[in-house]
Design a protein with these regions (language model features):
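Bacterial N-terminal signal peptides
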Residues: 2-13
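Extracytoplasmic copper-binding redox domains, predominantly the cupredoxin/blue-copper superfamily
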Residues: 15-133
């Protein structure tokens, strides 16, 4: 099913219902090799198990990037064993992009890490991702 949405004065035509109903989370992958979440001092994402979310990402170039032009990564790992969550290994190009994802069904602590060596500060590019029941 297709729905019509008016956002910020612009008519968005033909968006699938899943996108229209998804919770939007604004993420910045910044030039200082840090994740930032709109409205939060400490970056953390808190979501419900199985929830549909739309990651609205602004990616800013740091000091280095991949050959394919990716400047930051966003990989979701289970905190307990650091294994990847399927479908959550994203690469960001410069600028704005959106990713529709379903939150894992297993409640618990996860961590988001950058998988692109974006600068000397790359190891510090991570944030908490909590899945609530």
């Amino acid at each position: 099913m297709v729905v019509w949405i008016v956002a910020a004065g612009a008519l968005l035509v033909g968006l699938p219902r899943a996108i229209a109903q998804a919770r939007v989370i604004e993420v910045t992958a910044d030039s200082d090799s840090r994740y930032k979440i709109a409205g939060l001092r400490t970056p953390e994402i808190r979501v419900k198990a199985g929830e549909q979310i739309l990651l609205r990402v602004t990616a800013r170039r740091a000091k280095s990037w991949n050959r394919d032009g990716s400047i930051h990564g966003f990989t979701l790992l289970r905190a307990k064993d650091r294994t990847k969550v399927e479908g959550w290994d994203l690469l960001f190009k410069p600028g704005k992009q959106e990713f529709l994802r379903t939150v894992p069904s297993e409640a618990g602590e996860y961590v988001v890490v950058c998988t692109v060596i974006c600068s000397e500060e790359h190891e510090g590019m991570h944030m908490k991702f909590t899945v609530l029941p």
